């Protein structure tokens, strides 16, 4: 009951129908980062609250968007404030990078030193690619404009990397890269207006 109550309270406070989006889509809208971020946040928080009813959760941690979920679950941040933040965060990101002009590339089975060398080599040309996320050993995520992504694919295809594979991330905006520098500055202004509490 507590989980349903928390969800209902958040649904009522948004300037779009979050509950309908969660239940009915459409997928094209959910894939836009300004909507995917709040839907993922709410879903992950509610799942954590439900899981805690089954067994106590003592520690939370999160990366990127997941950090907001961890802050909410540990009572550092109100869920309604977090939804407001990530919706604004997603909107800023969406506005910063026109849809379809940039992306994120997962590079599998490439030694990390080779990944960094590839980035250096590509950045010495007319392209700019950033190391976005180190997901796991042999799983690197890069971010940049489409032309830089293609440069990475060509670099790998023309090199002696027998087991290396690539895959595009299904996101409308690349994360953790230079293309979002201005969005980061704008988000900081809203973050300064939100109350953060000690975890409990």
Whereabouts are the PLM-identified features?
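Acyltransferase loading domain of fatty acid and polyketide assembly lines
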Residues: 16-35
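Hydrolases whose catalytic domains are alpha/beta-hydrolase-1, hotdog thioesterase
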Residues: 69-73
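Single conserved hydrophobic/aromatic residue that forms the stacking wall/gate
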Residues: 1-11
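Gly/Ala-rich beta-loop-alpha elbow adjacent to hydrolase catalytic centers
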Residues: 44, 62, 66, 78
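Alpha/beta-hydrolase active-site loop
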Residues: 38-45
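Alpha/beta catalytic cores of group-transfer enzymes, especially the acyltransferase/condensing modules
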Residues: 16, 74-200
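Short beta-strand immediately N-terminal to the catalytic nucleophile in serine-hydrolase-like folds
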Residues: 57-61
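Conserved acidic catalytic loop of the alpha/beta-hydrolase fold
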Residues: 47-55
């Amino acid at each position: 009951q507590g989980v349903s109550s928390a969800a209902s309270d958040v649904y009522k406070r948004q300037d779009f129908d979050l509950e309908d989006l969660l239940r009915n889509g459409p997928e094209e809208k959910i894939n836009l980062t300004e909507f995917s971020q709040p839907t993922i946040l709410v879903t992950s928080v509610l799942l954590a609250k439900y899981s805690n009813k089954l067994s106590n959760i003592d520690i939370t941690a999160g990366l990127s968007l997941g950090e907001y979920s961890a802050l909410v679950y540990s009572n550092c941040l109100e869920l309604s404030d977090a939804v407001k933040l990530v919706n604004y965060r997603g909107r800023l990101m969406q506005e910063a990078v026109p849809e379809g002009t940039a992306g994120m590339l997962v590079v599998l089975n490439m030694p990390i030193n080779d990944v960094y060398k590839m980035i250096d080599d590509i950045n010495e040309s007319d392209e700019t690619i950033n190391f976005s996320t180190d997901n796991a050993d042999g799983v690197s995520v890069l971010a940049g404009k489409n032309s830089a992504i293609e440069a990475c694919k060509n670099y790998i295809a023309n090199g002696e990397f027998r087991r290396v594979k690539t895959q595009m991330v299904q996101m409308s905006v690349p994360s953790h890269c230079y293309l979002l520098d201005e969005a980061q500055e704008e988000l900081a202004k809203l973050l300064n207006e939100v109350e953060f509490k000690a975890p409990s």
